[in-house]
Amino acid sequence: MKFFLAALFYYDLDIPTLIRFLGGNYTGEYRDVDSTVKILQESDCNPTIINDLKKILTVGFPIKFVASTSRENFLHFLHYGNHTSITKNVHKTTKALNKEDRNQFLIPLPCWLARFLKHLHITPQGLLMKKDKNDRMIWDGSFIPNWDAVSINMMLSHESEPEIVYGETFKRHLQYLYNFRISVPNDEILLYDDDVKSAFRHCKYHPDVASAFAFIIQENLWIPLGGMFGSIVTPANFEPVARARTHLAEYFSRRRDLLKRYDHIIDKVKISDPPTKGTIFTRATPCKYNRGLTNVNNTQFSMFVDNSLFAQTRNNIKHAMAASIEALHVILGYPDLEVRQNPLSLDKYFESSCSYERVQLGITINTRNMTIALTDKKRLSMLDELSHWHKKGRVLHFFKE
């Protein structure tokens, strides 16, 4: 922290200049954006996606942010502090912040500087704790401590940011599976998906506005450098990354040389046993909307925020996995573990098997039976919720059956 403080004094307490001075992982300048754009153009990617991605990776985001605030508004948030989930879980909060600092997603400074820095706003923080999941810091950009206050999310707009399309992901994925089954009625279709690690953090704020997204925890002022979970513009500005990645992954899925590059990762994934001789595959019937795939060797990828869903035959699934990883590295940079973490979430990569039946986006999909279903955990959770919602309990009979 002393290093950052000394540099900030040297640059006359100017946060944008400090960020530009730091460079490297702090700004994402290690990425070869020109090469990425060239590959996207050669692969006939949508020009809008290319332009949005280039802006995000070189200029930063939001695309547009024009706002003003007052000293009184600043003090409303400064005096409020953080939500009780932070103050009651100091140890967990500190652990989460140390991880963010280690990955160079934040700049830590003494909190007393908050009154002296230009264009600074303080946003309350919360800690989301769920069973069997890592604790997640919540940047509560929509919260206001009183009706006179104006939050950062109230100063921003969706209209000027990239289009959000991930709401159609699951539907698109299921339609792909249906058409796949039309084209391969007697072959195993395996399901898999991978995640981007710290996805939103890879999209960097424009240095001139980074301090508007600041927050204070304990004695430290934190300046975030990448997208915060809770900002209304963060998901939209990750969309060009996701869309460019899925486009490149499909383009790379034709190649058969990438598996050798990533076999040290892919070979660790457990793949379900082949079907037995008596296995029956449920057929999919062609119609005017679904006629099958033009080329079953090409893989279609669909991303729901940071989660990339795909499916392939047993002969091609590993090539699809390699294509997905390569596309991620082309967009966000190749791993250099001595200086930064792998953008691929390896812990999630190995925690489940590649199979004809897999839970994707919380829904169990089975490509042999061509069915989708709630997981037992979700079904029981719903039953428990409904038991408190309706006193007479009549609504439960359908779900129990």
Where in this protein do the model-derived segments appear?
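Conserved aromatic-histidine-acidic binding/catalytic patches
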Residues: 81-88, 226-237, 296, 300, ...
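Hydrophobic side chains in beta-strands
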Residues: 65, 127-128, 139, 217, ...
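Surface-exposed beta-strand-to-loop junctions
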Residues: 72-80, 215-227, 301-305
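Short acidic catalytic loops
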Residues: 138-141, 191-195, 296-312
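Residues that flank catalytic or metal-binding motifs in active/ligand-binding sites
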Residues: 121, 211, 304, 359-361
